[in-house]
Swiss-Prot record:
Record PTM text: Met-1 may be removed after translation.
Disulfide-linked positions: none
Family stated for the protein in its record: Belongs to the actin family.
Keyword Lipid biosynthesis: no
Signal sequence bounds: none
Key word ATP-binding present: yes
Function: Actins are highly conserved proteins that are involved in various types of cell motility and are ubiquitously expressed in all eukaryotic cells.
E.C. designation(s): 3.6.4.-
Catalytic activity, reaction form: ATP + H2O = ADP + phosphate + H(+)
Pfam families named in the record: Actin (PF00022)
The protein's name in its UniProt record: Actin, macronuclear
Length: 357
């Protein structure tokens, strides 16, 4: 299989990242949602496809349609000519893994497949095999402790608080200023504001006081139709939701720092020091300026004083999972890891549990 270029596909909760092994960044990055036009007359002059994949779509697309789009439209490859690495969320049910394996072999006739846990790939992208990955995407935030390349399932923690919740929360904060963003198109504008202007305050109370006393945090944002709006404390109040879900928006969830701390404490005492010293941020919702310093401060307040806590927030962490997959499949030692078509034909979909641990 050395002459066949490997495709690496990271199916995130909100965004698909796809490309080729050995490259530094994915070739294609697109939302994993689909919609059918509600009002066809409004789309006169637009390509009359019955389905649209991208930002304007409202429903999750079936995984089969996403893969079709990935192979034939985005990467422009014939899947039966390429080994494929797919990613999965931690604690994915066995039936899901088998179904994914079955669909991809039987529909696309792949020569070979490997399924890897997203957080493990994030760790590999930083050149590590032990650490705890805090992965915040669009739909979920996970903390996944990993020891010598294997995740520790009983210590994995998840909350349903991530990128889309922060977008909705920022829209709610804007209503207090008299700006109403409610339609899906308007929420896309809010998402853009969030990604471009929001940041984490190291000390929230201090930043809030400063924002009342001065205009130092205020920034202007030009809307598509030309109107300019001003935002101030919303810039740091929005992502504060990750650190104070109850106080900020009345949700009784673990904060991102409690989630991380609890996952570490669930692990054997002998590995905790290694985990505290290798806290890896991953995913688009960890891209806020200041988030690494803030998480470090919060974990240091909880960890034993004898431990030197370290949080790694690499600049490319939005694509950490994809890059880990690109790196892993490029290793010469990886060749024996693939589930080949022959393996699948001989053993069925359950082979995924033996080959992809």
């Amino acid at each position: 299989m050395s002459d066949q270029q490997t495709c690496v596909i990271d199916n995130g909760s909100g965004v698909v990242k796809a490309g080729f092994a050995g490259e530094d960044a994915p070739r294609a990055v697109f939302p994993s949602i689909v919609g059918r036009p509600k009002n066809v007359s409004a789309l006169i002059g637009v390509d009359s496809a019955s389905e649209y994949l991208g930002d304007e779509a409202q429903q999750k697309r079936g995984v089969l349609k996403i893969w079709n789009h990935t192979f034939y439209v985005e990467l422009r490859v014939q899947p039966d000519e390429h080994p494929i690495l797919l990613t999965e969320a931690p604690l994915s049910p066995k039936t899901n893994r088998e179904k994914m394996t079955q669909i991809i072999f039987e529909t696309f006739n792949l020569p070979a497949l490997y399924v890897a846990i997203q957080a493990v790939l994030s760790l590999y992208s930083r050149g590590r095999t032990t650490g705890i990955v805090c992965d915040a995407g669009d739909g979920l935030t996970h903390t996944v402790p990993i020891y010598e390349g294997f995740s520790i399932p009983h210590a994995v923690s998840t909350i349903q608080l991530a990128g889309r919740d922060l977008t909705t929360f920022l829209a709610k904060l804007f209503t207090e200023r008299g700006y109403n963003f409610t339609s899906s198109a308007e929420l896309e504008i809010v998402r853009d504001i969030k990604e471009k202007l929001c940041f984490l305050a190291l000390n929230y109370e201090s930043a809030l006081k400063q924002s009342h006393d001065s205009s130092q945090f205020e920034k202007n944002y030009e809307l598509p139709h030309g109107k300019v709006i001003t935002i101030g404390s919303e810039r740091f109040r929005c992502p504060e939701y990750l650190f104070k879900p109850l106080e900020m928006n009345g949700r009784e969830l673990d904060s991102i720092q409690d989630l991380t701390y609890k996952s570490i404490q669930e692990c054997d005492v002998d590995v905790r020091r290694d985990l505290y010293q290798n806290i890896i941020l991953s995913g688009g919702t960890t891209m806020y300026e200041g988030i690494g310093e803030r998480l470090l401060k919060e974990i240091e307040n909880r960890a034993p004083k004898s431990i030197n806590v370290k949080v790694i927030a690499s600049p490319d962490r939005r694509f950490a999972v994809w890059r880990g997959g690109s790196t892993l499949t490029s290793l010469s030692t990886f060749a024996s890891m693939w589930i080949t078509k022959e393996d699948y034909d001989e053993n069925g979909a359950s082979i995924v549990h033996r080959k992809c641990i």
